[in-house]
Amino acid sequence: MDMTAAQVHELYKLRVDIFVHEQESPYKEIDDTDIHPGTQHLLAYETEGGVHLIGTARVFGKPDEGQHIGRVCVAKDARGHGIATQLVKKALEVCTERAAGIDPNKGALIELDAQSHLVDWYERFGFVVDGEEFEEAGRPHKHMSMRI
């Protein structure tokens, strides 16, 4: 699905509000991954009082080389309602659909870089930590992966 200019604006505004302002992270939020033809953006909308973006995630990478889930975020006033869970579940569905042609004996690799305080949350989906803690944009992260 191609995004409209308004959707792109909402996407960047939400991510900058969360990752740059709220988390005080000097992260370069606009990157080439967003425009890559293989990147799929997942968008969650609130419809009460008008339609506005409240959550997003992205899936990118090739199924035979490893897919990546990233930039999962939910607006501060929309947290606690399972939106991030729905976004990750949908991202896993997208990864599974993309991996349909992969040898089932090998499985398809899905990766993400979780902020360290969210490791337990991602483990609920089946991800496991597979590396040492590292810093990205001033925050501790751990690389996690799973095979489907």
PLM feature spans:
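Conserved GNAT acetyl-CoA-binding A-motif
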Residues: 95-115
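Conserved catalytic-core motifs of GNAT/GCN5-like acyltransferases
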Residues: 111-113, 123, 128-143
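Conserved beta-strand in the GNAT
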Residues: 43, 50-61, 65-73
